[in-house]
Amino acid sequence: VRENVYVNCNKYYTILIFITMLFEISDGKKCDIFVHIFNHLKHFTDSIVLTVSPEMLYIQGMDSGHICVYELMLQSDWFQKWEVDNKQTYGISVPILNKILRICSVNQTIIIHSDNDEDLQIDFTSEEKGVLNKYLKMPLMDIDTDHLHIPDTEYDVDIEMDSKKFKNLIDELSNFNETLNIDCDGEQLTFESSSGEGTMNVIITTDDVELLAVVEDKEIKASYGIKYISQMCQFYKLSSTCAIHITQDIPLQLKYVIDGDSIMRFYLAPKISND
C-alpha cells in the first residue's frame, strides 16, 4: 500500500508525516455542507464509524431507539483531494467532531488525515491574509459495528418536493401531535396530525410538489413519529429538493441528493397500531 506524504511547514521547521488517509474540502459551499451534516447528526447518535475507501466516505448507523437508520455516501470526486488507497474505518465521537468543525472559519479549507490508529487530525487552512491556520487532533474510539444490509425497495408512493417546504410542513404538523398519519386512497395523498388541541390536514397534489407518483388504486395508511421526521428535515440544506418514499408497513425513506451519487438518506420505521 502506498503511503502519502503530508508536509506541514512554518518558518521554524518542517515536519514530514507519513499518512494513511487524507481528504480535503476547499469549496466553501461543500465545507458548509460537511459541517452541517455533523452538526445535525449529533441528534441521532453520539458515535459513528467513518469508513473511507478509494471510492467514497461512508457512514451508516441507527439512533439509540432503533427507530431510524441514517446513511451518508460522499463519493471521492465530491472532495477536492482524496488520497485513500484502501478501506479504513475510524471510530469517531460525533459531539467532539462537531465541536471541532464549528471552529472552521469562512473561506478555510478542511483537511482531515490520519497517520495512526489513535488520532484523527483536522486542519483548517487558508491562503487569505489575516486568517489563522488551525491544527486540531481528536482521539479515535474503538467501536464495533456491522453495517445493515438495506434491500432495494419499490415504493407505492414517491414524492419529490422542495426541502425547505417539507421541513416547514413537518414543523407545522408537529404542533398538534407526535404522530404523522399518511393516508393515500390512490387518488389523493393526505398528511394529518391530530390531538385534543386540534387537527391539521394537508392534501398534497401534483401541483404542490416536483413529483407525486402513486401506484394505481393503491390504498395506504401509515403512521410515523414526527420528532424523527423533524430531525431528518434539519438536513434540508444538503439539497434544494428531497425525495420521500412510502409503502405501508415498511420504513419510510427520506433522501437528499447532495451531488451526483453523493447522498444522505434516512429510513424511519412506522408506528405500530394498537388496533
Predicted regions and their residues:
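DNA polymerase sliding clamps and clamp-related checkpoint/processivity subunits
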Residues: 16-42, 47-175, 181-275
